[in-house]
Amino acid sequence: MSAPVGIPSLLLALCALLCVLNAVRSAYCPDPYKRYSDQHSYCVGVCCSCAKYRRGVSPWLKKELVRLHNNLRSKVAGGKSHSVDHLPRATNMLEMVWDDELAEVAQRWSDKCERKSDCEDCRRVGRFGVGQIIFEFDGKMDGKDMENEFFSRFMALQSFRKEQVARFTAGTNPKTAQILWAKTWRIGCGFLDFNYPGNGRRYTQIVCNYGPKGNEEGEEVYKAGSVCSSCPANTCCGDACKKHNLKANYHGLCKVIDENLPPEGNVPHKKTGNEVFYCGFNDESDCRHTVEGVDRWIRNVTTGGTWLNTYLGNYGHTVIEVRSAHHLQVRQAMPGHQDPQWTHGGRTTLSVPAVRGFGGGRQILNLTHLPPCRR
């Protein structure tokens, strides 16, 4: 009779099997993620060297995370606590909802057992850039731990200043700013209870991804003024939600009516210098454009806004001409790669060459998003 297989041997066998399964899983990496980063968190697989006790966000934790975020935002936006009397009320802060794609990317990164954030491009999704906060607890976490964490975040607001609301800078607390960022309205998180290989200690980690990302240098965290007075289109607030057969659960927050469409501003957008393209790419005359070369520009309406996308094959080239030059602003479009070229001289155009070696000889350009052009 053979001796029983020891527990360490079983663990090694299970780990080996897990690595094989993750190699198979990681072999599939959607093209958009590849274009953002060859180390995209969705695609890099998990760490086999850390022992995992639990993984994945439970239905209860999913609801709790959304509730805790919205409770904190509501207290600030609606001024419903003496602890935030020094901060202005918010006119445009959105109610957060759960996002499965953000959650899946966050879970993939959490499974790496890294105890640090991934890179911005590593977690980006097609609809928007993604912010991130990691909540970490020693040992096993319970519901009170998460409540206490958000209570400490709330108390930290006492040191958050009015001028920091008006303009985000490097000195602003980034976690507080991201939680309060008015235009961020989608959240998805990953959960892992594990032994960290670096010191052998047990931790519980919740990685939360936020979109559209906040903490944009020079921009306001939220717009100060009368509560809900600048709620964007496709949102409602308070009793106004009843006519849409919706219930406003959080005082002072603008609730998105159709979660498949973006909330878009009902006031003119103030240019910040961060725009790639200041145009909603709708059908208004001042947004019209013509294309020379590869005509694969596609208008996509997403939860992150309206995008004009193009995909170029090897050696492809496209030129897009926009009728109104005052709608254009430029930023570096593909850091680390060849940038598209703006040309002037009677025309306002964007010339985009394909770059070999980038995404397998492929290049994609997104021209973004923002409110529709105004007559």
UniProtKB/Swiss-Prot annotation:
It holds the Pfam family CAP. Expressed by the venom gland. Residues 66-210 form the SCP domain. It comes from the Eukaryota. GO terms for cellular component: extracellular region. Belongs to the CRISP family. Venom allergen 5-like subfamily. This is Venom allergen 5. The lineage of its organism: Eukaryota, Metazoa, Ecdysozoa, Arthropoda, Chelicerata.
